[in-house]
C-alpha cells in the first residue's frame, strides 16, 4: 500500500493522474487547509482512486490514522507539499520511499518556497527541505520543466479535465472571470491586507466580472459576485465554456492561468504587482499578457539630476518607466551636460510623465533644488542618472509611507551586484531601522542611499533644501537637518541597483569614495 498526501483540489487532480500512471494501491490523506467547501468535496474525490481515505480536519486524526493503518505495510509516500509538517509526521524515510508530484506554480516559477531556504527543518529528526528533495525517487509532473527537481527525476503525466460530454457554447456570449490568490505570505496579516487591496482594485478595473475565490486562502472583497462552486477552476472552466462561447480569465500568477490558456475560447491575462514582477515575467514567456496594477495611488514627483551620463541615463529612465506604480512625473534636471545626455533624454519626452530641464552647470545640490521647485506632488523620490530601480521600488516604499503618517522620509537597500536583484522582491521584516536608533546612527554614518529615498516635499522645504556648499555629501547634510527621532525609516529590502560607470574613472573613484563613506564620521568626509 502507498500513501498519497494532498492539501488542495489541484493536488487531488494531479494525484489522480499519478494513480493512473502507476496502477498501484493508495491510501489517500487530505489535510483541510480552509473552510472552503471544495476542501471536503475534493477529499471525497480521492475515494475514486484510493482504496481508503482520511480527511484531516481536527486534532484526533493521529489515533484514527494509526487504527486505519495498523496492519498495513506502507511502501511509498507520495507528496506535493514538500514542507508540510503534518505530512512529515507521517512519512518515515526509514521504511518508506518518497515520491513527489506537482504543487501548482512552484513547478515552473522560481524562486519559490521550495527553492529558497532549503536548509530549513521541515519535519522530525531534523529533516531539511533539501533532504526531502534529495529523497524523492521521482517527481510526477504535468509540466515540461521543473524548478525544484532535476530532469532525471521528472516523470511526465497527462492532465486533462475536459468532461467526455463537453460541448462548447456557440452563442457569442463573453464573460470575464478573476481567479483569487494570496500574494506574499498567506499567514501574514499585512500581506493579506495587501492581497485584498490589490484584488479589489483588479476587480474594480475589470468591471462586470465573476470572482472565483482561492480554495485554501480567504480573501475579503466587496461589491463583486463571488461564485460559489464545488469545482476547482481547472474543471470549472468547462462549465463556463458550456454557457459562454468566450471566457476571459484574469489573475495574478495562479497555476490555473497556465492550465487553461490553450483551451479554445479562453484568453488569459495577468496583473503585474510589486509583489509579482518576477512571476509575471515568467508568464510572459508562456505567452500570457500582463497589465500593471499599482498598490498605491499616491502622486509622486521623481527628481533625477544628470551630468554627462549619456551611457547610463537611458537605463535609469527605463527603470522609472518600468515601475508597477504609475502615478508619477519624472523631472530630469540636466546640469549643463557636455556629452550626448540631452539627446538621450529627449527621446523619452513622448511620454507626458517625463519632463526635461537643462540648466547652466551649477552642481548637484543646485540641480536638486531646481527639481524640488518644479515638484508639485506631496511626495518626492530621488533617482540617480546611473542607478536603476527595480520595478517594485516605488510601490513598495510608498505603501510603507502611507501606512505610517508620521514618516517624512523612507529609504531602502541597494546593491552593486545585479544578480542579487533578480527573482523579484525579497522583503525582510528584520533589521529595519527607524526611530531613535536610526536618528543616532545618522550622526556617524550616512544610512540612506540617495537613489532609494522618498520624502515629503514639505519636510525638505522646512529643512531648507540641499545646501550647494556640501556637494558630494549633500544628502547626508540634508538628513542631518531633516531627520528626527520618529519621522524616518530605512527598510532592509533591496530595491535598486547601484551603478558604478566604468567609463568615467574620476566618477568611479568618487562614487566608491561615497560608498565607503557610509562607515565614516561626517568630520572625516569633510576633510
What residue ranges belong to the model's regions?
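Short, charged/polar "capping" segments at the starts of alpha-helices
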Residues: 13-14, 34-42, 86-87, 108-109, ...
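Short loop/turn segments at strand-loop or loop-helix junctions that form parts
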Residues: 31-32, 80-83, 98-109, 175-184, ...
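Catalytic binding pocket for nucleotide-activated donors in carbohydrate/polymer assembly enzymes
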Residues: 256-294
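A nucleotide-sugar donor-handling region in carbohydrate enzymes
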Residues: 101-182
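Conserved catalytic-core segment of nucleotide-activated headgroup transferases in glycan assembly
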Residues: 172-213, 217
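Nucleotide-sugar donor-binding/catalytic module of glycosyltransferases
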Residues: 295-516
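Donor nucleotide-activated moiety binding/catalytic core segment of transferases
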Residues: 59-65, 215-263, 283
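Active-site and donor-binding regions of nucleotide-sugar-utilizing enzymes
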Residues: 4-123, 256-258
Amino acid at each position: 500500500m502507498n500513501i498519497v498526501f494532498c492539501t488542495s483540489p489541484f493536488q487531488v487532480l494531479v494525484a489522480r493522474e499519478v494513480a493512473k500512471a502507476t496502477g498501484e494501491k493508495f491510501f489517500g490523506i487530505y489535510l483541510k487547509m480552509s473552510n472552503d467547501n471544495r476542501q471536503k468535496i475534493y477529499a471525497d474525490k480521492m475515494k475514486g482512486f484510493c482504496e481508503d481515505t482520511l480527511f484531516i480536519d481536527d486534532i484526533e486524526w493521529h489515533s484514527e490514522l494509526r487504527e486505519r493503518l495498523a496492519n498495513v505495510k506502507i511502501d511509498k509516500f507520495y507528496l506535493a507539499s514538500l514542507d508540510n509538517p503534518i505530512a512529515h509526521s507521517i512519512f518515515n524515510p526509514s521504511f518508506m520511499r518518497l515520491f513527489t508530484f506537482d504543487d501548482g506554480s512552484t513547478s515552473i516559477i522560481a524562486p519559490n518556497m521550495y527553492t529558497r531556504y532549503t536548509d530549513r527543518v521541515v519535519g522530525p529528526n531534523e529533516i531539511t527541505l533539501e533532504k526531502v528533495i534529495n529523497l524523492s525517487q521521482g517527481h510526477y509532473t504535468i509540466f515540461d520543466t521543473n524548478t525544484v527537481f532535476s530532469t532525471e527525476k521528472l516523470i511526465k503525466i497527462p492532465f486533462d479535465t475536459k468532461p467526455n460530454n463537453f460541448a462548447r457554447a456557440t452563442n457569442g456570449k463573453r464573460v470575464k472571470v478573476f481567479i483569487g490568490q494570496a500574494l506574499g505570505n498567506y499567514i501574514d496579516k499585512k500581506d493579506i491586507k495587501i492581497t485584498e487591496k490589490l484584488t479589489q482594485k483588479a476587480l474594480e478595473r475589470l468591471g462586470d466580472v465573476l470572482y472565483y475565490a482561492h480554495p485554501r486562502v480567504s480573501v475579503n472583497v466587496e461589491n463583486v459576485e463571488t461564485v460559489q462552486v464545488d469545482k476547482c477552476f481547472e474543471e470549472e472552466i468547462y462549465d463556463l465554456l458550456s454557457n459562454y462561447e468566450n471566457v476571459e480569465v484574469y489573475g495574478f500568477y495562479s497555476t490555473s492561468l497556465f492550465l487553461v490558456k490553450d483551451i479554445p475560447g479562453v484568453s488569459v491575462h495577468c496583473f503585474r504587482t510589486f509583489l509579482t514582477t518576477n512571476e509575471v515575467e515568467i508568464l510572459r514567456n508562456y505567452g500570457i499578457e500582463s497589465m500593471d496594477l499599482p498598490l498605491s495611488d499616491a502622486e509622486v514627483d521623481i527628481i533625477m539630476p544628470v551630468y554627462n551620463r549619456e551611457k547610463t541615463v537611458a537605463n535609469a529612465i527605463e527603470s522609472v518607466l518600468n515601475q508597477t506604480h504609475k502615478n508619477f512625473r519624472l523631472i530630469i534636471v540636466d546640469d549643463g551636460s557636455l556629452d550626448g545626455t540631452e539627446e538621450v533624454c529627449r527621446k523619452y519626452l513622448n511620454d507626458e510623465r517625463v519632463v526635461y530641464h537643462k540648466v547652466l552647470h551649477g552642481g548637484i545640490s543646485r540641480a536638486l533644488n531646481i527639481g524640488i521647485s518644479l515638484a508639485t506632488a506631496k511626495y518626492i523620490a530621488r533617482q540617480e542618472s546611473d542607478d536603476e530601480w527595480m520595478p517594485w521600488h516605488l510601490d513598495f516604499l510608498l505603501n510603507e509611507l502611507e501606512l505610517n503618517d508620521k514618516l517624512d522620509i523612507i529609504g531602502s537597500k541597494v546593491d552593486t551586484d545585479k544578480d542579487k536583484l533578480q527573482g523579484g522582491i525579497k522583503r525582510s521584516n528584520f533589521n529595519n531601522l527607524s526611530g531613535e536608533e536610526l536618528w543616532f546612527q545618522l550622526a556617524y554614518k550616512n544610512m540612506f542611499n540617495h537613489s532609494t529615498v522618498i520624502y515629503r516635499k514639505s519636510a525638505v522645504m522646512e529643512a531648507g533644501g540641499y545646501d550647494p556648499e556640501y556637494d558630494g555629501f549633500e544628502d547626508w547634510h540634508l538628513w542631518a537637518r531633516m531627520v528626527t527621532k520618529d519621522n524616518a525609516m530605512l527598510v532592509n529590502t533591496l530595491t535598486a541597483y547601484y551603478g558604478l560607470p566604468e567609463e568615467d574613472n574620476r566618477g568611479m573613484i568618487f562614487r566608491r569614495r561615497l560608498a565607503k563613506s557610509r562607515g565614516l564620521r561626517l568630520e572625516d568626509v569633510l576633510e
